[in-house]
Amino acid sequence: MSQKKQKIQVEQKVPENVAKKTQRDSKLRDAVAKRRTERLAANKTRRAQWEKTAQAYEAEYKAADKSLVDNLRKAKTEGGFYVPAEAKLILVVRIRGINTLNPQVRQTLRLLKLRQLHNAAFVRVNKATIEMIRKVEPYVTYGYPSRAVIKNLIYKRGYAKINGQRIPITNNNVIEQQLGKVGIHSVEDLIHEITTVGPHFKEANRFLWAFKLRGPRGGFIAKRKSFINQGDWGNREDLINDLVKRMI
């Protein structure tokens, strides 16, 4: 008589500590995946908002340009004159070095963020800043920057000043972390605040490190002569844009 061999299946029980670790790891993976999904969704929403804001600014700029053209045409048709609003923003560029600088001039250049040759900085127009520029006028040239030049400077030469460090503005997160509390979340917000000399211009301008430009293509004409005397230093008004384009 043949005997049936019974197979005894031994159920191996997973140790409790291993089971708990597996469960914990699974929950951790789920939490990480959830956070990643939420982060991607938030980034998508922010990018959409940045794009919407940029489009709104572009519409605002076009409307302002159209208004200026319309006013000029109207004045010409009526035989009158149209006087644009006074400039609220100046771009100052240092064109001479440090030789034979007296302490007062040196300090004023530092206050204007012009510590080095070919540094450039934005300055809000008021009585105090005009007096500062006059003190250092033989060492700088300045004028009224166009929106295009402001944009090119920030995009191509813009660095942030964070805790005394010069940090490249590689994405909008750098701006949002430092200026989000005053409503500046993106590079287009930053450009708009500078261009319009908005209510938080001080914070926006303080955030920007001085622009480090190169010597202009073709060189300067005569740095020891004023611009009105066929030289370089002093007020160029709108012609500052031609110079800065050669220095970016």
From Swiss-Prot:
Protein name listed in UniProt: Large ribosomal subunit protein uL30A
Protein family: Belongs to the universal ribosomal protein uL30 family.
SUPFAM superfamilies, per the entry: Ribosomal protein L30p/L7e (SSF55129)
Compositionally biased intervals (Basic and acidic residues): 8-41
Any Gene Ontology biological process: maturation of LSU-rRNA from tricistronic rRNA transcript (SSU-rRNA, 5.8S rRNA, LSU-rRNA)
GO cellular component: cytosolic large ribosomal subunit
Ranges for region Disordered: 1-44
Organism whose genome encodes this protein: Paramecium tetraurelia
Secretion signal, residue range per the UniProt entry: none
Pfam families: Ribosomal_L30, Ribosomal_L30_N
Keywords: Ribonucleoprotein, Ribosomal protein, RNA-binding
Top-level taxon of the source organism: Eukaryota
Molecular function GO terms recorded: RNA binding; structural constituent of ribosome
Protein function: Binds to G-rich structures in 28S rRNA and in mRNAs. Plays a regulatory role in the translation apparatus; inhibits cell-free translation of mRNAs.
